[in-house]
Curated annotation (Swiss-Prot):
It is a single-pass membrane protein. CDD domains: CYP57A1-like (cd11060). The keyword tRNA processing does not apply. GO terms for biological process: abscisic acid biosynthetic process. Its cofactor is heme. This is Cytochrome P450 monooxygenase ABA1. The chain crosses the membrane at residues 13-32. Pfam families: p450. It comes from Pyricularia oryzae (strain 70-15 / ATCC MYA-4617 / FGSC 8958) (Rice blast fungus). The gene is ABA1.
Length: 512
């Protein structure tokens, strides 16, 4: 009995000691973290805890929250707001270029760890080592940009014709009677188009989202369900180290044997990759074929194919549906663009087929709509945190210690009054046609930061612009769109990309 009491007492003292040491360690860490970035204003909770980032990551307003915190706490002296114990945020285009230039020594931070869904390897997005990233991008970049695909434009045209066919087949509305009213959720339909486009470009065969008019493999739902915890783990380093560690992913992550969702898609894509490396493999003029020709191994291709889907569909869909909604909500802009489209058709500038990218670039108001739409609907709203290199860095006259993560407010960069004027909240394509060429080029360079910059620029930027140039022209050429519910035109959540649904529109056929 006496020995048991002694043992219990020792156990209690050991436990108390461990808790005391842990408490002192955590308190000391918080004090050190607080002091090293105390010069930067920000939400008080964020200065010593990741709870502020974690809570706001789950609100579904990520892009707007980052913009609002920059507006509230940003000071004239520098371009940074503190959002975490070791984390800053900026809305400065100059800082973004500084961190991302080809010669920059900034690193990818732990934020990128959560883009890894397969524990067996890294993709171009999740790879942390800069030299390895650059070497991989040199091999895969031509494929992502579509430069090795001689059928790039015709493949996109084919999927656009399928989108038009779906609207004509199922969703054209007639008069006012109930039987002829067929509203379509254009938010979902736009994503079907981008998904089929990227799978056609990547593997020479679209997965059939448009033909089936359904979420093939439950991909969209799976990505939406996974987004909130992924964001929490990307912004909270400890959570990322735990839940995106190889052992955890092996036990709980998606696998190619899954019956639905991302895992099912992984399994399908691995079969596609395997067919390019088997004894009967044939070279194909698509993204995957480019990867193989440029020396990527079968395992490396398996890592890249899932990235192709996410990076090539969710992002562009955000810009497409957001801009379409703004067009429908701004009649003067809608009619002005439609007038330019009609004149291009009547003049013979555009034939009966899908407009070419070369011709689309010659239409000034269409280009203004594209850039204004990108500005107000950034395809990616995540923080994309970079890490300050060894030795620290001095920016705007303030020193930032090594190892600090710096995130980017995509919306903040696109709402800068010193770049776009005082009416930045307004969808006004005229700002692009009324200014001189020097100002237009400055605005364009700022807007194109939605695709990243320098070393970290999105390799698929060219493909995205090709889709944007064609979709607005062809849809407004053939149809009229009317928002069904003007009070709640769309349901949106921002989790790195914008997840949109229930953007119901009435579609009627135009006769030129």
């Amino acid at each position: 009995m006496m020995l048991q009491q002694v043992a219990d007492a020792l156990a209690t003292h050991w436990l108390s000691g461990i808790l005391a040491i842990a408490t002192v360690y955590l308190a000391t860490s918080y004090i050190i973290d607080y002091r090293r970035l105390r010069a930067f204003p920000g939400p008080p909770l964020g200065s010593f805890s990741y709870l502020w980032l974690a809570y706001n990551a789950l609100q579904g307003r990520q892009g707007s929250i980052f913009y609002e915190v920059m507006k509230r706490y940003r000071v004239p002296e520098h371009s940074f707001v503190r959002i975490g114990p070791n984390d800053l945020m900026t809305d400065s285009p100059e800082v973004v270029r500084h961190m991302s230039s080809a010669r920059s020594t900034y690193l990818r931070s732990s934020w990128y760890r959560t883009s890894k869904l397969d524990p067996s390897g890294d993709s171009l997005l999740s790879i942390m080592d800069t030299a390895h990233h650059d070497a991989l991008k040199a091999k895969a970049g031509r494929g992502y940009a579509g430069r090795d695909n001689r059928n790039l434009e015709s493949d996109i045209d084919d999927q656009l014709r399928r989108l038009i066919g779906l609207l004509e087949r199922k969703y054209l509305s007639g008069g006012g009677d109930a039987s002829s009213f067929r509203p379509v959720d254009m938010a979902t339909t736009m994503q079907y188009f981008t998904l089929d486009s990227i799978t056609k470009l990547a593997y020479s065969s679209a997965f059939g989202f448009l033909d089936l008019d359904t979420d093939v493999y439950g991909y969209i739902k799976a990505i939406r369900d996974a987004a909130p915890p992924i964001i929490v783990c990307s912004e909270w380093p400890l959570a990322g180290r735990i839940f995106f560690s190889p052992p955890f992913l092996k036990m709980f992550g998606p696998t190619p044997k899954d019956k639905s969702g991302v895992g099912k898609l992984m399994g399908t894509l691995r079969q596609v990759v395997a067919s390019r490396f088997g004894p009967d493999a044939k070279d194909q003029p698509d993204m995957l074929g480019s990867f193989v020709r440029n020396g990527l191994s079968q395992h490396q291709c398996e890592q890249e194919v899932i990235l192709q889907i996410v990076a090539g569909s969710d992002t562009t869909a955000t810009a497409l549906r957001g801009t379409l909604l703004q067009l429908c909500s701004t009649p003067m802009v809608y009619l002005k663009l439609q007038k330019e489209i009609d004149e291009a058709v009547r003049s013979g500038m555009v034939g009966e087929g899908v407009i070419s990218q070369e011709t689309a670039r010659k239409l000034p108001y269409l280009q203004a709509v594209i850039y204004e739409g990108l500005r107000l609907n950034p395809p990616f709203t995540g923080a994309l945190m970079k890490e300050v290199p060894p030795g620290g860095d001095e920016i705007d006259g303030v020193f930032i210690p090594a190892g600090v993560r710096i995130g980017v407010s995509a919306k903040g960069i696109q709402m800068r009054q010193d770049v776009y004027g005082h009416d930045v909240d307004v969808f006004r394509p005229e700002r692009w046609t009324e200014c001189d060429e020097q100002r237009r080029m400055r605005m364009a360079a700022n807007t194109e930061l939605v695709f990243g910059y320098g070393r970290w620029m999105c390799a698929g930027k060219n493909v995205a612009f090709m889709e944007l140039n064609k979709v607005y022209f062809e849809l407004l050429r053939r149809f009229d769109f009317q928002v069904v519910d003007t009070k709640t035109p769309v349901k949106e959540e921002s989790f790195n990309v914008m997840f949109s649904k229930d953007m119901f529109m009435k579609v009627t056929k135009r006769v030129l």
